[in-house]
Amino acid sequence: MDTNTLPPKPSISPSIASSFPTVKPFSSQNSTTSNPELSHIEKESNASSIIISQQPLSPSNISSAAPLDETHIATKASASLRNNNVSPHIPSPSSFSSSSSSDLDKSMLDEKHPDSEDITAVSLSTPPFPESIDVARFSSEEKKILSRIRRKLDLRIITCLWITYFLSRSVTYSISLSLTMNKHQGHSLLQTVSGLNYHTLSVGTGLSYVSLIIFDLPSNLLMTRADPRLWLSRIQVTTGIIGACHAVLGTKGSSASGFIALRFFNGLAIAGMWPGFAFYTSRFYRDQHLGKRIGWYYTAAQISSVATSLLSAAFQKMDGLHGLYGYQWMFLIWGVVAFTQGLFLPRWLPCIKHNQHNEKWISWIRIPKFLGFLKASENTGLTPEEEEVHAIYMAEMQVGKSWTLTDLADAFLDVRLWPPIFMFFGVVGISNGLVNYSSLIISEINENFSSVTVSLLVAPIWVFDAIAILTVLPLHDRFHKKMLFFVGSCLFVLAGLLITTFVSNVWGRYVGLLILGFGLGPTVPIIMTWVSSAMGPSHGDVGVAAGLAIVSGLGNLGSVVATSALYSGWKADTTFRRSNETMCGMVGIAIVASIVMHMVQKFNIRRFPFKRIYACLSERRKKELSVT
């Protein structure tokens, strides 16, 4: 158990400090009857009251405190702040659960009240009371306000992210479709680019995921230092530019090396988008409301796959128009639309409000007056009352908390970060393998299918994927059984792979692909929600940003395996049977990792047995605290 993980204690103004109640530490002789002030507090059990237990403070009873949710949310510090119209930032009980009792006592008793040596003045960054804390409940009116807040945020955030992800995935998914477009006319991507074959295709696709893995973490960490809206806008704009540049493929000077370079830069441009979406969303929604919202905008990937599959049939009709192949028109149109939409992201998305003094490196970009309509919005769209309630609702997530390299290292060494990597490895490898090679897999099922038929048969796979997201994730948020829902989804994936691999009937194998798509749908949103809820209360912004980026980045090694070593990258596997069998093994890895994650959280395991490393981190943290 780490004994040096307390956050630094900032200075606090007298006006705010006076809003905190002062409480004498309990002794063994104290009782409710001998303490009139405590008796009075315990009698106030309405919606905004708080009960202070007489149980002595210890790390065990702090860590066992129930997690804050909509019905258990505000500590006495938050209630006091609310009464004084101050936006609170309340530390999570879990944020100091790994500290020793002596360290907690020292940190909470180092400021003395002028009238008594036994009374503490509570800091905003330390636990408000030297006793175990029970929490108040939101009133029915506040619950209505929270529902209204979520509806307002959904309209701006989820709508914007859905469209952004839809266009981004359309740009990416167009590569897969271009492999078979106008094949019978000899105008597919494979037939018109000199030197491009299945091997170079696998190399290019694999390199796109390599660049994604390398740049996911720095891209997501920048979101804690820059305005996330500006960074997401940069990602979408560059994705559109690189997507449109794919139209040069098929011209006289194009080659396989040009395709490989474009795929690498596409991965570089898009790096940080998916974990960035999850990070941004987690700054507005708590765990019990986050999963289905990630699922909502994740359906954009599935709908995009359907839309691009259907629209590719129309693009094939444009083949030869103005001297361009059908796939060149597809790259150009999707790229330009994505670029244009990316310019409006800062204006569309609400800003993240917090009361931390965490200055952003980039919070605005100077633009000409005639482009003033693109300027980033400076409000959340909420009323002051709604912002106050939302601040209490999000208090445990430590939104806007500043961080150092020591905090980043501490997040990396959190045990809860690593099982989701293997979960992501398994399911995303399969998902991206299906995205990139679905048209080839269907063509292998029946070689007599035309290119248009193949494009149309791809679409229902992603319809089933979207249906699963919309039906499973609301149940996941309601019952909070992450492992159960994840393992159940993985079993659907496994069943789909086995049917597609071993059934001889053509349409039976296609049904296996539909089952596979249904199982894949809920897996990624569950993983991202799991990581955010585990890392946010303990590590703040840096924990969520780094955790999501590491899981997404290293987990995409599964995509490298699926796109480079399997399917078209496995020359001897002409029927894709061995590739599907390998995918079954990857599903097994994901299932085992989810069980490990469940056990790690059940037994509250957060640290590896690396005593020397944690000792070094503790010393470094002490030096940082002494400087501040």
Swiss-Prot record:
It comes from the Eukaryota. It comes from Schizosaccharomyces pombe (strain 972 / ATCC 24843) (Fission yeast). This is Uncharacterized transporter C1B3.15C. Its main location: membrane. Residues 103-116 have a biased composition (Basic and acidic residues). Residues 12-21, 48-64, 87-102 have a biased composition (Low complexity). The chain crosses the membrane at residues 157-177, 203-223, 230-250, 259-279, 294-314, 324-344, 417-437, 454-474, 483-503, 511-531, 542-562, 583-603. InterPro entries: MFS, MFS_trans_sf. It is found in: Membrane. SUPFAM superfamilies: MFS general substrate transporter (SSF103473). GO terms for cellular component: Golgi apparatus; plasma membrane.
